[in-house]
């Protein structure tokens, strides 16, 4: 940069007055402090002032930039001798509205006061510049306006609190669960919301019913069974009773008592009114295990004990043999009864008074009348139940 300035200064004539102290101010009046060492090195390498020894002495003594004290520039844009130091035309003068007619006519030739004036900004003013200002003193927005800016963006920035942006409709439903309603039963409260095939909301009960059965949940609840306390006014349509253990219905749907209902079910005809009883006949239900044990014990006892009452000596002998050798597997037990107890005490054996009567549990034996002892013995041998008695 400085080499270019040196070359151009050596080739062309100077466009400013090389009088001593033209580019310099006193140290007290200069608003910017420039180090002496840097200025001295720059002045020794670049010869801005030529042709007078006074100017050289000034550089060596003051070591400051000198500037013309005249308020007007040495050349302007209308000068017929433009500066040969730069290859571009000088900037046009800028009218800043001040009483002074001087301004920036070149990037190098400026007055001493105007050179540092932009550095000191007034209270209500702005920095001066030879270029077109790109920002106005009063900003209308916090950022420069672009091709896509509009007033909505600026109003958003000027607002103190940010605008809350609402989400999708699904988010609103999630935030407001009370706004949902079951399309089947109309319920608004449920532990879990479900959806049907079309996307409508269902409550948990309707959703599960539809999922398991493939049908919509019925809204009509099934009729509960009326408790017995509410059936006080009922009466049987057949016998007109009001007390029963179980209410039934006939083929016509009328309430009937348990007895009339069972009779109609078993016989197919209405129960006769003559069979009506004042009280309710109930049966005592016993455990099945106890009944079986009692029946088995009674059968065993009856098979071992055989009671016979003989009316003669011969029959008593045979009966004793039967008692001693009686088979326990026999199911029938013969019973011999006597019609004349006095004959047994006297020991008289009249043919008319000797009567043997055999009675079986199943009625296999009927009353048998034997007139003599030989017939009794023959009958005993023929019977199968006393076969071991004569062996």
Swiss-Prot record:
Its main location: nucleus. InterPro entries: GATA_N (IPR008013), TF_GATA_4/5/6 (IPR016375), Transcription_factor_GATA (IPR039355), Znf_GATA (IPR000679), Znf_NHR/GATA (IPR013088). In embryos, expressed in the presumptive heart mesoderm. In adults, widely distributed but predominant in the heart. Gene3D superfamilies: Erythroid Transcription Factor GATA-1, subunit A. Transcriptional activator that binds 5'-GATA-3'-containing motifs within gene promoters. Regulates cardiac-specific transcription during embryogenesis and thereby cardiogenesis. One of its GO terms (cellular component) is nucleus. It is found in: Nucleus. Residues 57-107, 277-334 are annotated as: Disordered. This is GATA-binding factor 6-B. Residues 70-89, 292-319 have a biased composition (Low complexity). One of its GO terms (molecular function) is DNA-binding transcription factor activity, RNA polymerase II-specific. SUPFAM superfamilies: Glucocorticoid receptor-like (DNA-binding domain) (SSF57716). A zinc finger (GATA-type) spans 182-206, 236-260. Residues 57-69, 96-107 have a biased composition (Polar residues). It comes from Xenopus laevis. GO terms for biological process: canonical Wnt signaling pathway; cardiac muscle tissue development; cardiocyte differentiation; cell fate commitment; epithelial cell differentiation; negative regulation of transcription by RNA polymerase II; positive regulation of DNA-templated transcription; positive regulation of transcription by RNA polymerase II. Residues 282-291 have a biased composition (Basic residues). Keywords: Activator, DNA-binding, Metal-binding, Nucleus, Repeat, Transcription, Transcription regulation, Zinc, Zinc-finger. The keyword Hydrolase does not apply.
């Amino acid at each position: 940069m400085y080499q270019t300035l040196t070359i151009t200064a050596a080739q062309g004539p100077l466009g400013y007055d090389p009088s001593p102290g033209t580019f310099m101010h006193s140290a007290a009046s200069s608003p910017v402090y420039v180090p002496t060492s840097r200025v001295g090195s720059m002045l020794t390498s670049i010869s801005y002032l030529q042709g007078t020894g006074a100017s050289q002495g000034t550089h060596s003594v003051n070591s400051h930039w000198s500037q013309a004290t005249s308020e007007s520039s040495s050349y302007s844009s209308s000068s017929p001798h433009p500066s040969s130091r730069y290859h571009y035309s000088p900037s046009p003068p800028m009218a800043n509205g001040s009483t002074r007619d001087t301004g920036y006519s070149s990037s190098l030739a400026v007055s001493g006061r105007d050179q540092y004036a932009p550095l000191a900004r007034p209270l209500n003013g702005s920095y001066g510049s030879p270029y077109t200002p790109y920002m106005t003193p009063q900003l209308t927005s916090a950022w420069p306006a672009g091709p896509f800016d509009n007033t909505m963006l600026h109003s958003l920035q000027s607002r103190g609190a940010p605008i809350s942006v609402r989400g999708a409709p699904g988010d609103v439903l999630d935030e407001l669960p009370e706004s949902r309603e079951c399309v089947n039963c109309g319920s608004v409260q449920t532990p879990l919301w479900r959806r049907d095939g079309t996307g409508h909301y269902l409550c948990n009960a309707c959703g599960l019913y539809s999922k398991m059965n493939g049908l919509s949940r019925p809204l009509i609840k099934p009729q509960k069974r009326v408790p017995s306390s509410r059936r006080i006014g009922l009466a049987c349509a057949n016998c007109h009773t009001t007390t029963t253990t179980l209410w039934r219905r006939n083929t016509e749907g009328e309430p009937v008592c348990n007895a009339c209902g069972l009779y109609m079910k078993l016989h197919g005809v209405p129960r006769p009114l003559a069979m009506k009883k004042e009280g309710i006949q109930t049966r005592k239900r016993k455990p099945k295990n106890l009944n079986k044990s009692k029946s088995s014990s009674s059968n065993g006892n009856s098979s071992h004990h055989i009671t016979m009452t003989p009316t003669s000596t011969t029959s008593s002998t045979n009966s004793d043999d039967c008692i001693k050798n009686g088979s326990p597997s026999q199911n029938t037990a013969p019973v011999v009864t006597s019609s004349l107890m006095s004959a047994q005490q006297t020991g008289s054996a009249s043919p008319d008074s000797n009567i043997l009567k055999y009675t079986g549990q199943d009625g296999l034996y009927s009353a048998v009348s034997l007139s003599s002892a030989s017939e009794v013995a023959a009958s005993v041998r023929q019977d199968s139940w006393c076969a071991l008695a004569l062996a």
